[in-house]
Amino acid sequence: MTESASGMKPVMYHYVRPGAEGLPHFPYLSLADFERQLEDFATTHGFVGRDAFAAWTAGGPAPSGVLLTFDDGLRDHIDFVLPALKARGLFGLFYVSSGPAVTGRILDVHKVHLALGRLGGERVLAWLEANAAELLPEAGMRGESSPHYAGQVSDEATKFVKRLFNWDLSGEERGAVLEALLDHAFAGSPPLWQDFYLDQQALRELSRAGMGVGPHSHTHAVSAELSPQRQREEVELSCEFVELHGGSRAWGYCYPHGLAASFSPETERAVAAAGCPMAFAVEARDIAAPLAEERRYALPRHNCNAFPHGTASYGGDEAASAT
């Protein structure tokens, strides 16, 4: 390594794939850039292995290096990420939402991603104005995107649509309109859940390969907006699901959305009551202390986009860093 590490650097990933055919506005980290980023991390920081991470959760000092984490239980993670990690002898933590495999349905948050990826923000907003105008705020407020997406490079229409569905509307309000929007975007043939997410067999395969598989809620709703009872249910359903299929709550919990506004002290209590030893959020800093000295139910993670070769690609199969 040419650069010494001073602690554990958790890094968060979502979509990692060679391309996104048919989704011209869909942001993802290209597989080529992911592999370049791994090579760069190997040179500059090194990686945290399974045993070192487990020792830290048991009370040991914070290990040095990059801790690789992957959210949402996406099909990308078994098809593309796992082979890349195995080829390099690397460890990763995979946090899985239980809803898709249990209900056979795509989560609302990913319906939004797919519709935006297919149509783009302006066309989605135009469809909403024509078909669900009653859900939209006053015209003068429609340009106000959420501060939660301030760090994203998406256009303002895309940020507004994400804010509307992920933060402003209730589950009941967004349910039917999202179904209709997705049906419109894909001309009546939207993706199937098993084409988008890990199934139970894939979860067991990750565990057999030595990866950590942990809980990431049931529906990926914003936890802080749910009742205390619903928050407890979200945590426990997810924990039970991953443990039924080779994972463990011992790998900790991962908050959906992850920003400070997305969870609350009530959420932290629910995670602790479920027996998870810690929980990951999103905050751009390293971990230098033992777990007992950290705020264990609000651990930080960096976004992979903040590092070299982390620029999002769109639609095609050419790595962003190669353009």
Q: Residue ranges of each PLM-predicted region?
A:
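Histidine-centered beta-alpha loop that forms part of the nucleotide-sugar donor binding/catalytic region
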Residues: 13-14, 97-99, 218, 284
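Short amphipathic alpha-helices and their capping/turn segments at secondary-structure boundaries
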Residues: 1-3, 82-87, 197-208
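Solvent-exposed loop/turn segments at secondary-structure junctions
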Residues: 99-102, 220-221, 260
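Histidine/lysine/aspartate-rich catalytic loop segments that bind and position anionic ligands
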Residues: 201-203, 207-208, 212-213, 217-228
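CE4/NodB-like, metal-dependent polysaccharide N-deacetylase domain
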Residues: 11, 61-62, 74, 83-95, ...
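C-terminal active-site subregion of NodB/CE4 polysaccharide deacetylases
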Residues: 1-69, 76, 107-116, 208, ...
